[in-house]
């Protein structure tokens, strides 16, 4: 096995409450068990790798690495770049016409003398890293790639719990605890809380659960119209089940009539297929990102749901609040910090042993923290809508159990 002399860190994709802390724990662990290993960070993810833009981990950074665990965001920056999307890389000026981004990135790693690449990102980030390692292996350059699973959607196979997701749910609940008070600014207020989650409803479920637990600890004064019912969650919609607008409006209308407001939690990916179909019928173009995913900020599920229910519930005011950026940029909570530290320290051990993969709780091995093999890494893991705690929450708020996927007309 080749001796590890130099490692590089790279964060990519959207933010999550684990990027800065993951790097902090990785640096600290290398400094503890392999102090002679040199370390660098590629600035702005794969963009920095393609451009040869990196920053050295100095002695000062080594000594104070754990400061990074108290912060959100990424100190070295992110970007959304797919190395196999040649057209996009050329368009953005990251490579010249005729160049293969994989080769450019591979050559940069070789020139920098990198033995281990630590990628912190979602399934796209880590499978791209696997492609890079495979490319280098064909060219007789043994690169060890050890990823950490970052996604607040918690939708990566076979990772039982992705880093930062618990924090994102907690922060989303805090966000709504404030903005829900806006329903007192207008009569018949419809408040939509749009939560991140392209294909998976886990974060929406968990955010609603955290929020309702916060309400459990909150004192109210019903005698002066300060009631829990007005601030509670009245509906939760996720991508894995359909929204029956007519049936739900019939259920929610009496609530609106009684408490003068309705509060809905909805995943940003709920009903997307139907919204896109409507956009295409109108001749509108649906923008996509570098990975071919529809730009959800352009699809705007929250606005769509708000408009449909606003009419059906005779709302005088419809407000859509998105907690995503607030939640994903937070520093990790104590529960996440423990998981991040365990995974980061395991990642260093794997790297020094020459073992590639994505380190996290392997749901196929009793949630043991280990390097999950790259061929098993895949996004789009759905939330289990049959989960007992989810169904119990729906029962508590008076919402029927979810049915098959897709939105009813």
State the predicted function of each range:
Residues 6-16, 75-77, 115-121, 147, ...:
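Short glycine-rich or small-residue beta-strand-to-loop segments that form or flank ligand, phosphate
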Residues 12-14, 42-47, 80-81, 122-123, ...:
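Short, ordered loop/turn segments at secondary-structure junctions
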Residues 16-26, 49-50, 100-103, 123-131, ...:
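Short glycine/serine/threonine-rich phosphate/pyrophosphate-binding segments
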Residues 19-22, 50-56, 87-88, 128-133, ...:
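Short acidic, glycine/serine/threonine-rich loops at helix termini
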Residues 27-32, 36-60, 130, 136-179:
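Glycine/threonine-rich beta-strand-loop-alpha-helix active-site module
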Residues 30-112:
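Glycine-rich nucleotide/cofactor/substrate-binding loop typically near the N-terminus or early
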Residues 108, 119-121, 127-131, 135-142, ...:
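Accessory alpha-helical/coil subdomains and C-terminal extensions
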Residues 271-409:
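C-terminal non-catalytic interaction/assembly regions of soluble proteins
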């Amino acid at each position: 096995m080749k001796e590890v002399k130099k490692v590089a860190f790279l964060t990519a994709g959207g933010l999550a409450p684990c990027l800065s802390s993951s790097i902090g724990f990785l640096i600290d662990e290398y400094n503890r068990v392999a102090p002679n290993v040199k370390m660098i960070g590629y600035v702005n993810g794969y963009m920095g790798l393609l451009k040869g833009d990196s920053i050295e981990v100095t002695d000062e950074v080594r000594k104070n690495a754990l400061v990074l665990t108290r912060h959100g965001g990424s100190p070295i920056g992110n970007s959304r770049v797919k190395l196999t999307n040649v057209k996009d890389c050329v368009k953005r000026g990251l490579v010249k016409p005729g160049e293969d981004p994989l080769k450019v990135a591979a050559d940069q790693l070789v020139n920098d003398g990198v033995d281990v690449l630590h990628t912190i990102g979602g399934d796209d980030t880590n499978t791209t890293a696997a492609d890079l390692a495979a490319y280098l292996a064909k060219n007789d350059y043994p690169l060890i790639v050890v990823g950490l699973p970052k996604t607040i959607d918690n939708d990566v196979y076979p990772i039982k719990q992705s880093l930062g997701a618990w924090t994102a749910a907690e922060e989303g609940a805090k966000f709504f605890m404030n903005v829900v008070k806006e329903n007192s600014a207008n009569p018949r207020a419809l408040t939509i809380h749009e939560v991140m989650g392209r294909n998976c409803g886990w974060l929406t479920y968990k955010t609603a659960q955290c929020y309702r637990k916060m309400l459990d600890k909150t004192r109210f004064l019903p005698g002066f119209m300060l009631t829990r019912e007005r601030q509670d969650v009245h509906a939760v919609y996720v991508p894995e089940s359909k929204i029956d607008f007519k049936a739900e409006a019939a259920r929610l209308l009496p609530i609106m009539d009684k408490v003068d407001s309705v509060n809905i939690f909805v995943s940003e990916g709920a009903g997307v297929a139907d919204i896109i179909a409507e956009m295409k019928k109108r001749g509108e173009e649906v923008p996509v990102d570098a990975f071919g995913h529809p730009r959800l900020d352009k699809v705007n599920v929250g606005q769509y749901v708000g408009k449909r229910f606003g009419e059906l519930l005779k709302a005088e005011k419809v407000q859509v609040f998105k907690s995503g950026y607030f939640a994903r940029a937070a520093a990790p909570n104590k529960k996440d910090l423990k998981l991040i530290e365990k995974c980061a320290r395991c990642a260093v051990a794997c790297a020094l042993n020459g073992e590639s993969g994505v380190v996290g709780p392997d749901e196929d091995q009793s949630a043991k923290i280990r390097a999950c093999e790259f061929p098993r890494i895949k996004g789009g893991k759905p939330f289990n809508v049959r989960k007992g705690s989810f169904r119990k929450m729906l029962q508590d708020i008076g919402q029927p159990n979810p049915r098959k996927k897709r939105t009813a007309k």
